[in-house]
Amino acid sequence: MQPQRLGPRAGMGPFCLGCSHRKCYSPIRNLISQETFKFHFKNLGYAKGRKDTFLCYEVTRKDCDSPVSLHHGVFKNKDNIHAEICFLYWFHDKVLKVLSPREEFKITWYMSWSPCFECAEQIVRFLATHHNLSLDIFSSRLYNVQDPETQQNLCRLVQEGAQVAAMDLYEFKKCWKKFVDNGGRRFRPWKRLLTNFRYQDSKLQEILRPCYISVPSSSSSTLSNICLTKGLPETRFWVEGRRMDPLSEEEFYSQFYNQRVKHLCYYHRMKPYLCYQLEQFNGQAPLKGCLLSEKGKQHAEILFLDKIRSMELSQVTITCYLTWSPCPNCAWQLAAFKRDRPDLILHIYTSRLYFHWKRPFQKGLCSLWQSGILVDVMDLPQFTDCWTNFVNPKRPFWPWKGLEIISRRTQRRLRRIKESWGLQDLVNDFGNLQLGPPMS
């Protein structure tokens, strides 16, 4: 299928954009009509008659370690210039020229079409020129992605630090709420929205997968030192060793979010991550890693056990941060692993409890406690530590609203499970043990 969109434009100016003295393009408006949104943002496989590109944008600035919204609005292609380029000209003139170059900005785009290969190239050059920007691009539909040049430049976007993803229900709802003259009405998903999202998402994953393979020339790219994980936009390879790509901030906030998810569709976005830090008693630097279970394959906990077994370690302390508590099978395998290694100290923190009301899952948690594994719920100190070690040590963690309240509720729920199985005293005994290397 060949999408319908304006053809390539000629005569783009030099970079930095805006220094070319082109006329400044302005947003068409802050809000678009419901009819325009439903027609142009519908994530169809074949989008007949949709030649225009709409770009809804939000610009935030970091102020005293907190994000502050500066601008939001809507661009549309104009004078044969695509919406993305119109935005970049506008952003240069209205933001970069006005505010200090030391300011840090986050830009979020919600687009009816993903960038064409020429726009993607221009965006890459713009990001390379301005290192104080971060850019997230969510697209309703993929434009001409069968073209090798388009695929290559989408990859270059990711390699330059942009986040590129397909719009899911969460993004459609957010876009509807902020950029549509909705008259107070809630967003009503159209038929096959989620099905079409999964198709667009899988195509994008396939295109971007090579972007995330990063093996240093001095490292061996064997299966033993490559861990598979996913992120936004999904699949990524991380290399264990001195240099490890961190989780993106967007990934962390969406995947470790500890509050109750009201809509079933959002559960498809909640992935089972396992971040671990291994500290040895011989003074060596801690080892870190992040794992994610693939659908239909081994869970992250099993990948973690295989990794630790291959190291043949004895006296170590391991801290794990999980987005979901282990399933019964993973719990029993973790428990068996711990019983075979009494000198190993394993502490598991989980953001959310997985099927905690079902007896087999409760029994799995009990097997962890009975084996001597410490299982607890992530609270603000753990979220902060996870952020520092696996996301961005240079930026402070900004807690979401209600984080500590929800953590305490989840802790009470976990405590009730312990009490219902008569394990509270046992867990308290483990908590009072002196954990550490033998005293000389």
Swiss-Prot record:
Changing N392S: In cell line MDTF. Changing C275F: In cell line MDTF. The active site is at E84. It comes from the Eukaryota. Residues 49-165, 249-368 form the CMP/dCMP-type deaminase domain. Its cofactor is Zn(2+). Changing T150N: In cell line L1.2. Transmembrane segments: none annotated. GO terms for cellular component: cytoplasm. Gene3D superfamilies: Cytidine Deaminase, domain 2. Changing E84A: Decrease in cytidine deaminase and antiviral activity. The keyword RNA-binding does not apply. Changing E301A: Decrease in cytidine deaminase and antiviral activity. Changing T410A: In cell line L1.2. It catalyses: a 2'-deoxycytidine in single-stranded DNA + H2O + H(+) = a 2'-deoxyuridine in single-stranded DNA + NH4(+). Homodimer. Interacts with mouse mammary tumor virus (MMTV) nucleocapsid protein p14. This is DNA dC->dU-editing enzyme APOBEC-3. The gene is Apobec3.
